[in-house]
Amino acid sequence: MQTSMVSAKVSIWLVCSVICSSLVRATQSVCSSQNTATTDGVRNQFQSNGWCSNNCAGHQFAIVQGFMCWCSDSEPSTQTSVGDCSGTCPGYGYEDCGNADKDLFGYIYLGQTPLSSVQSVETSTESSVYVSSSSITSSSSTSIVDTTTISPTLTSTSTTPLTTASTSTTPSTDITSALPTTTSTKLSTSIPTSTTSSTSTTTSTSSSTSTTVSVTSSTSTTTSTTSSTLISTSTSSSSSSTPTTTSSAPISTSTTSSTSTSTSTTSPTSSSAPTSSSNTTPTSTTFTTTSPSTAPSSTTVTYTSTTASPITSTITSVNLQTSLKYSVITVTSVHTMDTNISEITSRYLTMKKVITQIYSSTLGATPTSAVATTSASVGGRITNNNNSNTTNSNTPTNKSTEKKGYWDSPGKIAATFVVVGVVCLVIICILIYLIHHYRTRPARKAQDFENEYQSKFYQSKYPNEVTTTTLHTPSPSSNSTFSTPRLIYTDEKGQIMSESPSPRQSTYSLTAGSPPNDPSTLASPFHDPILPRRTSTFLHSPIQKQHEKMESNVTLGEDTVLVDQRLDPSKMLNTLANDDATNHSTISLSDNVDYSRRVLRLMNE
């Protein structure tokens, strides 16, 4: 009976809880003028808080205003009193659906957490994650480097202080392998690690790869000595001397050297300290690598992969605090081309690791520096420069000679342009001469014709006199007695009178002593038979004797014009002034002068 009553009460309590929770969820919790809806609004004629809440299932808020319903996942930044959203819902008059008159939206919270605790819950979660991450980082004190990092393993108890500002790790060495033509740099930082332990012995097995270098026509001896190895670094050198590598730390270096009658030995030495935990001793690391100054000129490299035997190492550490500032690995690739076979025959890979500022903070020791240089050559035939004095003998410097082209020689370029310029200048001069010669050809032909005419004319007129013919025009400064009258005046009697001389000098000089009215000399240069008849008036002239007594020294030039004086206005009155003017005929012209040649010359020009 009691059980049934208890079950009935529980049922009633559950029904009331469901009803109350539904009523609470369907009530406006925020009223705001902002609409932060993330979905499109839905219009419902029978809008109510319950219907909009069901429509926005899965969202944080259901927004109502009159007939509209929106869904949102964010709370508005500005809020007003919930009593302002007093608009009645169209579908259920007992509920409020915002306020359309005041443009207010009612927010119905659909989440399970109260509004006031949403932000605090998120903040608490972030803080928890942060603390968890810090715990993980602090607990991992053995290594924070990538998977290629090898750290010493100690059998003693290690205590590391928890510091949130930095991470703790034991001294580590990064081994990075890179292909040629790549450069990689690794930076590692660490904080002090406090370790207290006694002397212990650890046996470990590690695998390493050694390189055997065979030198042509020589004896190769390879010796590899390794001790206290937790981290292995391969160093290859080739010289006539014996390089020595010394180590004083839980870090060892395996060196393989191959030359003719040469052996390279690595002797790492680890420092020991008392086993008592109360004493502290600093530990420093020093790498010294001796490289030869000469190298063979031709070497054939052969690679052999071997597996080392198990290594037994003894580690002694006492309360050390070592800080590694930075570690740099530089990888340089050099490609060399052999000009004899015209192909790349060798590749050189050089790795240089520099570790600086290694000190012990317990005793305040002076900071020391350690430099470890690792070199490896990858490829086929190696050609070295025998005169190179470099620190690393495994990085030969090859000088490839390249043939210079035409454009790399300034002398060839200058000579070519000079020859081309001279040829172009000669061609231009020839063209100028041909153009000038062609343009002056008509004038030269006319001049030749005139010269020939004048020569024949005066030779036929004065055959017994000396005639001097000059085919060129003398310069005005020359000592020449030639003078050329500008105009030659003649009358009908054949008398020749000269006017003032012309500044131009004549190309023809004529000295006449015979009477100008000689029938034989007055003939045409082409011996025209008509001219003797025309000159008959000159033979019977009453003043013939007077003309015979006159000596004429007339110089005829190229531009000499024979003109009758009666045609010149300045000579018009000369006949009236002369005493024998009445004896001169003023009717006929000088028929003995052939004017046809002059006319033809003017027409041709």
Curated annotation (Swiss-Prot):
User: InterPro entries per the record?
Assistant: WSC_carb-bd
Q: Where is the composition biased (Low complexity)?
A: 381-399
Its localization reads: Membrane
Domain spans labelled WSC: 27-110
Any one GO MF annotation of this record: protein transmembrane transporter activity
Sugar-modified residues: 340, 386, 389, 398, 479, 553, 583
> Would you tell me the protein name for this molecule?
Cell wall integrity and stress response component 4
What is the species listed in this Swiss-Prot or TrEMBL entry?
Answer: Saccharomyces cerevisiae (strain ATCC 204508 / S288c)
Q: What is the lineage of its organism?
A: Eukaryota, Fungi, Dikarya, Ascomycota, Saccharomycotina
Q: What gene does the UniProt entry assign to this protein?
A: WSC4
